[in-house]
């Protein structure tokens, strides 16, 4: 079976990432890899629930942690959980393409939709120098990664253009 055929057998919400939640162990690995710390303003785009921002604030002591997701039910459930746990984080119900991420220093961005990626790369390019964009499985299209611990990848603003897909993959 070809990979394309296999992918067609998977549920659309799984492929889109809509129903995928990163395990806590994975989130912690990603945060260690990115050197997330007390001076960071962390954004989890497509957060799904409060786990990522909860770990960022409680264990990595970030200055600020914000989760954004377009699924109202998931955000409301996450808000209920953080209120019960008395955690000082922010959850926003919004399309990430419309969100204000201008004060971010570290962003976790794991999307597969090409339109969303293209739109967000434009936003990312306007962020402060040294802002880290963390992706999983692949770097931002057409840019060289700054740091790789596969499957985790970091691109830093300003992005470095790749001359070819081969250069991007070999970096």
Please give the residue ranges for each predicted region:
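Conserved SAM-binding loop
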Residues: 78-79
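C-terminal substrate-binding/active-site "lid" region of AdoMet-derived donor-dependent transferases
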Residues: 115-171
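Conserved SAM-binding strand-loop segment of SAM-dependent methyltransferases
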Residues: 85-96
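S-adenosyl-L-methionine
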Residues: 1-37
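Conserved class I S-adenosyl-L-methionine
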Residues: 39-48
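Conserved SAM/SAH-binding beta-strand->alpha-helix loop
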Residues: 71
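A short SAM/SAH-binding and catalytic strip from SAM-dependent methyltransferases
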Residues: 105-118
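Conserved SAM-binding loop of SAM-dependent methyltransferases across substrates and taxa
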Residues: 50-62
């Amino acid at each position: 079976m070809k990979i394309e055929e296999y992918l067609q057998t998977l549920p659309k919400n799984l492929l889109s990432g809509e129903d995928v939640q990163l395990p806590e162990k994975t989130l912690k690995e990603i945060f260690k890899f990115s050197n997330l710390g007390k001076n960071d303003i962390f954004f989890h785009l497509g957060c799904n629930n409060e786990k990522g921002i909860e770990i960022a604030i409680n264990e990595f002591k970030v200055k600020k942690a914000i989760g954004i997701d377009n699924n109202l039910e998931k955000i409301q459930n996450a808000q209920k959980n953080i209120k019960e746990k008395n955690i000082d984080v922010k959850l926003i119900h919004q399309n990430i393409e419309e969100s204000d991420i201008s004060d971010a220093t570290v962003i976790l961005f794991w999307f597969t939709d090409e339109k969303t990626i293209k739109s967000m790369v434009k936003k990312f390019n306007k962020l402060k120098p040294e802002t880290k964009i963390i992706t999983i499985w692949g770097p931002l299209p057409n840019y060289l990664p700054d740091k790789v611990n596969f499957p985790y990848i970091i691109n830093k603003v300003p992005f470095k253009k790749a001359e070819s897909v081969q250069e991007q993959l070999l970096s």
